[in-house]
Amino acid sequence: LSHRKEAASYQVAHFLQAAGYRIIPVNPKLEGQELLGEHVYAYLKDIPFSIDIVDVFRRSEFLPDVAYDFLETDAKVFWSQIGLENEEAETILRQANRQDIVMNRCTKIEYMRLFV
C-alpha cells in the first residue's frame, strides 16, 4: 500500500476502509509506520492474524513473487487490480490448491457494482 494519497492503492484502500473493511497495509519500505490507522507490515507473512483478501497493486511481472508470498499465509483470496494479471502467478496458486483467484479487476469497482 502506498502512503501517497494520489496513488490508486491508497484511494482504493481508503474507500474500502470507509465501507467497513479492515485494511492491513503491506509495504517493506514503510514497515513499522502507520497508514490508514493501521500498522504497516513488511511482508504478508508478518501479519499475525488471518487474512481474507490480498489485494495486489504491484506490476504484473511481480505477481509470481507475490503469489509465493501469498502461499506463506492463510489468506483466502488472491486479487490483482485492473491491468494486472500473470499466468505464471495463477499456475503457482492453482498448483498449491489455492483456487480463489481474481485478476484484472478493481475491488472498489466490484464493491460499487455489487453493493451500491
Language model features with spans:
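Short secondary-structure boundary segments
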Residues: 1, 82-83, 105
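NAD(P)-binding Rossmann-fold cofactor-contacting core
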Residues: 2-7, 13-34
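Amphipathic, non-transmembrane alpha-helical secondary structure
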Residues: 14, 45, 64-72
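A short helix->loop->beta-strand "cap" motif at the edges of active sites that frequently abuts
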Residues: 19-21, 73-78, 96-100
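Glycine-rich, highly charged phosphate/nucleotide-binding loops
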Residues: 33-65
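Short acidic, glycine/proline-enriched helix-loop-strand junctions
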Residues: 49, 86-111
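ADP-ribose/adenylate-binding Rossmann-like module
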Residues: 70-93
